[in-house]
Structure formats: C-alpha cells, structure tokens
C-alpha cells in the first residue's frame, strides 16, 4: 500500500508549512474512489452536504451517502458491504469521523462511546475494506492511501496504561502500526480540511512519511512517545482484534 496517513486536528498551522491550495494543487482524480467517514450526522445533513459539493464540481463526479454508525458493528459491516458492492476499487480512505465530550455511554461492543467511535469502529471498518484497498494497490500506477484524523491532544495523554485521552493515542498507534500509516492537522473548517486533502490527494508519494505524523500543512512532526512505541502499538492491535472476536465481528 502506498501510504497510511494520520491527520491531527490543530487550531493553528505550523511554521514551515508547505504551500498548498486544494483548488490548484490536487491532481486529476478521475476514476478514483474515495471514502470519507463523518460526512453528515444523518441522511438529511449528508444530502445537504452532497448538494453543496455537487454545485461546485463537474456533473460526472458521483457523490453518494452510505449510512454508517461507528458504534454499531452491524452498521459498519453493512457500510463496508455497500462500498464493495458499488465499486471494485478504493483509492483513498479518510477516517474523518470522530466524537468527544459526550454523556457517559457505551457502544454495542461495550466500549466507551468516544473510544468505540474514534478507534474501534474505524479499526473494524478499515479491516473490512483492507482487501479492496490492497487489490487496488496492485493495479498499475495506483496510489492508495489511508488518512486517519487525530489530534495534538494525543500529546497530553498520560502513561499508556491510563484511560484519559487514550482514544487519541490509540488512533495514533493504529495509524503508525497499520502499514505503517500517516497523520495531519487543521484550523477553520476550510483550513482544517487542507491537511487531510494534502495527505489524501495533494502530496506526492515521496512527500509522505508512511506511518508518520503530519501537522498543517504537510509538516512531519514528532509524536507522543507512546504513539511511537511498537510494543504498545502491537498490544493495541491485538487487543482490538480480540475485542472484535469477542463481539463476533
């Protein structure tokens, strides 16, 4: 696979950021299939977003909404099946959805909502879509990427064994171990999207650090020491796989 990108959400761009204008710096993506999670809270919101996107792109660009509840294993499986049914390829997967500061609660797997949504749900979705990603990566001139949005908040996480802020750290470890993957950051809605767009489509292969952590825009940044720890990453991966097995997923 060409690259696994982690994207961190930041309030400010960093000094030394690369020059990047999505409108002019993203190459022609004709024929590519891109999946972005978190495109709308519900069908109405998603359709409003799709209408807005279609008003500014060519008519031959197909934009569709696929229902996905990252707290539900069944919903995740259904979404992956719909993706594979609609296309035999997947060029870019952007793990954009995320929640925080919600009332206490659990996902169907029995995980705390924030952890279950931001980490476990995306892990399961990626696992189901991995065969399609790998198949696409085998094609000539392919450039398959997985972008995982995270946060500089992972730097404030305490020791790995403690719970506070661990879902941010888990996303960092997940991406770092995955292939090994990448990462990014943001500001306003428009500015915040730039780092993800850069990693997903704007950056050339040689500009990406597979498994690295990129902050806005395109700067390879050092990560929390736990996020760089391969043993911790292995433990997280194995724990997540075990949790999926326990949930019969």
For the regions a protein language model found, what residue spans apply to each?
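Short alpha-helical patches at coil-to-helix transitions and adjacent helical residues
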Residues: 73, 119-122, 189, 193-196, ...
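SDR active-site lid
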Residues: 162-163, 167-209, 216
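Pocket-edge positions in alpha/beta enzyme catalytic cores
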Residues: 68, 184, 225-228
């Amino acid at each position: 696979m060409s690259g696994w990108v982690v994207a961190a959400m930041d309030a400010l761009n960093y000094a030394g950021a690369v020059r990047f204008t999505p409108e002019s710096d993203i190459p022609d993506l004709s024929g590519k299939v891109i999946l972005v999670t978190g495109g709308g809270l519900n069908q109405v919101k998603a359709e409003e977003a799709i209408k807005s996107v279609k008003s500014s792109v060519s008519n031959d660009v197909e934009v569709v909404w696929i229902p996905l509840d990252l707290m539900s294993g069944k919903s995740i499986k259904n979404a992956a099946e719909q993706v594979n049914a609609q296309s035999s390829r997947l060029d870019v997967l952007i793990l954009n959805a995320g929640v925080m500061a919600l009332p206490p609660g659990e996902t169907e797997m029995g995980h705390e909502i924030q952890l279950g949504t931001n980490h476990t749900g995306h892990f399961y979705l990626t696992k189901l879509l991995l065969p399609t990603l790998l198949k696409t990566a085998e094609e000539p001139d392919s450039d398959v990427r997985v972008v995982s949005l995270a946060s500089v908040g992972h730097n404030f996480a305490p020791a790995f064994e403690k719970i506070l802020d661990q879902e941010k750290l888990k996303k960092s470890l997940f991406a770092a171990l995955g292939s090994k993957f990448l990462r990014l950051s943001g500001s306003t809605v428009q500015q915040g999207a730039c780092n993800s767009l850069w990693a997903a489509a704007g950056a050339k292969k040689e500009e990406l650090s597979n498994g690295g952590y990129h902050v806005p825009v395109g700067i390879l940044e050092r990560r929390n020491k736990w996020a760089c720890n391969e043993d911790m990453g292995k433990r997280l991966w194995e724990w997540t796989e075990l949790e999926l097995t326990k949930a019969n997923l």
